[in-house]
Swiss-Prot record:
Protein name in UniProt: Putative glycosyltransferase ALG1L2
Region annotation Disordered: where it falls in the sequence: 40-66
UniProt KW keywords: Glycosyltransferase, Transferase
Gene name of this polypeptide: ALG1L2
An annotated GO cellular component: endoplasmic reticulum
Known EC number: 2.4.1.-
Biased composition (Basic and acidic residues): 43-62
Length: 215
């Protein structure tokens, strides 16, 4: 907010230009790099050609160098969180198809939530919690299939910058509702809004069904 001659002007955040949909070649290189330290990004099976480079989501042909998406790849979901007490949602993923959840960010409750996540016994969901330095996050956001925004505001007045970044990356997103979110996210118009874990689970199921039809 800025005050000018007694009246207020609302100024909205804009995403940086480096937030954008990532080319498939860049996605593949990112997946291979993350696969060196995070098993959910590694190939589920070995390619017939040992020279073919394969991740959990993509593969590069050894002859042409062409990168393609795998047909039976898992969906890739990202949630970038500050790991605070305002971001407390649990999810029972028993009815979801194959899904890789990447949760990034740094905050006071990171280790606490990490322990809770690893106590879960999901059938089809893999979770990894990388810490991406500097400009490591934009390529990931430009490569995933869905974002889940758990950002809220203790004041109810701060809009989540992370959703703005998702818009720039042309990502579908599900955002947890709070007081002023409607200024940015319009439910079923530009993104989806949820109130609790049950609504989020229903939205994820809807997304998963659509993903399976397209993949």
């Amino acid at each position: 907010m800025g005050a000018t001659a007694g009246w207020a002007v609302t100024v909205y955040d804009k995403p940086a230009s480096f937030f954008k949909e990532a080319p498939l070649d860049l996605q593949h290189r990112l997946f291979m790099k993350l696969g060196s330290t995070h098993s959910p990004f590694r190939a589920r099976s070995e390619p017939e050609d040992p020279d073919t480079e394969r991740s959990a989501f993509t593969e590069r042909d050894s002859g042409s160098g062409l990168v393609t998406r795998l047909h039976e790849r898992p969906a890739l979901l990202v949630s970038s969180t500050s790991w605070t007490e305002f971001e407390q949602l649990t999810l029972d993923g028993q009815n979801l198809p194959s899904l890789v959840c990447v949760i990034t960010g740094k905050g006071p409750l990171r280790e606490y939530y990490s322990r809770l996540i690893h106590q879960k016994h999901f059938q089809h969901i893999q979770v990894c919690i990388p810490w991406l330095e500097g400009r490591g996050l934009p390529p990931l956001l430009g490569s995933v299939d869905l974002d889940v925004c758990l950002d809220t505001s203790s004041s109810g007045l701060d809009l989540p910058m992370k959703v703005v970044d998702m818009f720039r990356c042309c990502l579908p997103a599900c955002a947890v509702n709070f007081k002023c979110l409607h200024e940015l996210v319009k439910h079923e118009e530009n993104r989806l809004v949820f109130e609790d874990s049950e609504e989020l689970a229903a939205q994820l199921q809807y997304f998963a069904d659509a993903f399976l039809k397209l993949s």
